[in-house]
Amino acid sequence: MAKFQGYLEFDGARQQSFLYPLFFREYIYVLAYDHGLNRLNRNRSIFLENSDYGKKYSSLIVKRLILRMYEQNRLIIPTKDLNQNPFLGHTNLVDYQMISILFAVIVEIPFSLRLGSSFEGKQLKKSYNLQSIHSIFPFLEDKLSHFNYVVDVLIPYPIHLEILVQTLRYRVKDPSSLHFFRFCLYEYCNWKNFDIKKKSILNPRFFLFLYNSHVCEYESIFFFLRKRSSHLRSTSYEVLFERILFYGKIQHFLKVFVNTFPAILGLLKDPFIHYVRYHGKCILATKDTPLLMNKWKYFFVNLWQCYFSVWFQSQKVNIKQLSKDNLEFLGYLSSLRLNPLVVRSQMLENAFLIDNVRIKLDSKIPISSIIGSLAKDKFCNVLGHPISKAAWTDSSDSDILNRFVRICRNISHYYSGSSKKKNLYRIKYILRLCCVKTLARKHKSTVRAFLKRLGSGLLEEFLTGEDQVLSLIFPRSYYASKRLYRVRIWYLDILYLNDLVNHE
């Protein structure tokens, strides 16, 4: 990013309208192609002159696209011509793929510059451990054990493209770029049902940016309600809702709501509340009664339906009591568990036994969904009985073994924070026996004969790093006892959900 900083310097008079000219600058395409900025992008091959030979950036493709962008009519292909010549649709698809990659990079520029200017003069401590998914669970263990109820919300996606355009309009003050963005989106959706589209999608980074912008707009309203409820009389909240309602779209409802807004916030005021969002879901934890939880529930429904014009069903907001219900979050089932403790206290000659009850957050593995995911991938049947992986029998023995070991260690690594390891051991047993059955099927032998020939050394490959570390730290007597059965380890290097968690 530093080597392109000179290109991004512009005077203050052009700050509001500098984005659109960048679409016609070749160096921005080089910036989009840069591997450091696109390490998560799988569509970089469209910038290559030949993806199988050379792996070089093609300036000719970029120049042709820029020439077509000067005349936007050349980017429009009528449906009649698309049916007669599908190759035109393929060419147009490549153009829009390149534009989506470029748009994701260009629109992020003002956001990054604004974020950098807000941190000037401030000393920020970098904590890479907070990037881990497992860093959320220690926070939940510390906070949720003191709360009673949780509101589990599935964040809806905007149905209409204009909602995304209007949301982006609040932050990008460049009309030309927004018009071009709207044009590309609608043109892309006009022919998305054709066969040329089935194996191609727009840039994932582009849609991730749009989704985050949409969620950021929703959270700005929520945090406004949460933080400004103590000084409503001095807050000009009419302007806020006028911006959200897309330029007076529901004027009558706006007047009614503004008049009753202080009373609504008074009902939602709660000093003890925590908010966590990840992977399209958010949870709201509080100590309050079910009555206030129902008010929050209908607040979310009205917020999405009235202010964002997104149809949102009340069934997507679940109110759960942690002492009775399980909270499904990031592949774990979490609930509060009462842990009784007996403390012996002695004062002089008198001794007392004091019964204490400590509330702990119990995180368990959703074994049913994991077995369903394993059955879908042909590791076992729907009952959890291991079967051979027939599709892998053409690979070498070492390749088959390495695949199973890698899957087993990834699962053990991700679910190391489970309070009870019984379900984890069952998953590892399924994978081990599936591996043995696959190897036995390849060599046309039985499982018993195959294990007798190789011995127990084959199963030692499945010993995870966690088991090796714990066996070195704790004594053998402790390692073999049931105490280690409840040891929970949260790793701070897990940045993505496990594939089995995303089985749905």
Swiss-Prot record:
Function: Usually encoded in the trnK tRNA gene intron. Probably assists in splicing its own and other chloroplast group II introns.
Subcellular location: Plastid, Chloroplast
Protein's GO biological process: mRNA processing; RNA splicing; tRNA processing
The UniProt record lists the keyword Isomerase: no
Membrane-spanning ranges: none
Keyword tRNA-binding: no
Protein name: Maturase K
Keywords associated with the record: Chloroplast, mRNA processing, Plastid, RNA-binding, tRNA processing
GO CC, any one term: chloroplast
PANTHER family: MATURASE K (PTHR34811:SF1)
GO molecular function: RNA binding
